């Protein structure tokens, strides 16, 4: 077995698959799609090798995308018509985010338009001339260094059962961060990162929008839940992925 095949076996985490769709849990630090500078280490390339080993030649069509340093669920269609149907009908996408500071409300909606920042091909900004963007959030847990969260009040204002079982149970009892569940109503580039930075609560380790110097780091964002109506069967498909170990560890370390 080649090193690339070993990496696929280690990294490829398939959460759902049928004749039309593939949903994979992406780790942080890798691109979803190839670029001119990076090809073999991308998620798409690893999935292609996975199918090639089984003697299948598939052209996957992305339905959702994630930044390199964002982990979580990515949806691929195995047929272009499935891709088109899912994009047209839309999907319910939710994220778990570690945001710095304490949000002013336990539940809120951030509804600011976003546009590309002049002079940058990557960075976005709040701009009244930008495209409409809407993010709804619920605080799952919050505290500061002086206040300890008791076990029975980790999520008093939402049903913790909405989250994967191993998410809330492994959280630290004391932290300067806020764990937030986010629902996107639009899907703009860097939407969650820009929206929380705009209200003074940038994501943990987000050096693009959080004024943190240095090279890009793993930021506190995980695509944890996706739900949609299957284009063929018309049944509801819902897939979830718990907060990964590295973000749980960051949450715990922040309180020490």
Where does each model-flagged region fall?
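RNA pseudouridine synthases
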Residues: 1-256
């Amino acid at each position: 077995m080649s090193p690339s095949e070993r990496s696929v076996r280690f990294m490829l985490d398939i959460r759902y698959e049928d004749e039309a769709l593939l949903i994979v849990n992406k780790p942080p630090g890798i691109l979803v799609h190839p670029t001119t500078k990076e090809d073999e280490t991308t998620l798409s390339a690893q999935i292609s090798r996975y199918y090639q080993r089984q003697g299948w030649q598939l052209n996957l069509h992305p339905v959702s995308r994630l930044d390199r340093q964002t982990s979580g669920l990515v949806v691929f269609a195995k047929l272009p018509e499935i891709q088109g149907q899912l994009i047209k009908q839309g999907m319910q996408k939710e994220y778990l985010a570690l945001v710095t500071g304490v949000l002013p409300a336990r539940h809120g909606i951030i509804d600011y338009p976003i546009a590309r920042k002049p002079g940058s091909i990557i960075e976005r900004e709040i701009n009244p001339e930008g495209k409409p963007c809407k993010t709804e959030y619920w605080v799952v847990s919050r505290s500061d260094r002086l206040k300890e969260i008791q076990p029975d009040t980790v999520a008093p204002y939402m049903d913790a059962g909405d989250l994967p079982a191993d998410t809330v149970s492994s959280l630290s009892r004391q932290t300067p961060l806020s764990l937030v569940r986010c629902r996107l109503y639009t899907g703009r580039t860097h939407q969650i990162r820009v929206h929380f930075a705009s209200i003074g609560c940038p994501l943990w380790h987000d050096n693009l929008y959080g004024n943190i110097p240095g090279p890009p780091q793993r930021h506190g964002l995980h695509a944890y839940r996706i739900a949609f109506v299957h284009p063929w069967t018309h049944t509801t498909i819902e897939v979830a992925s718990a907060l990964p170990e590295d973000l749980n560890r960051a949450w715990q370390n922040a309180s020490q």
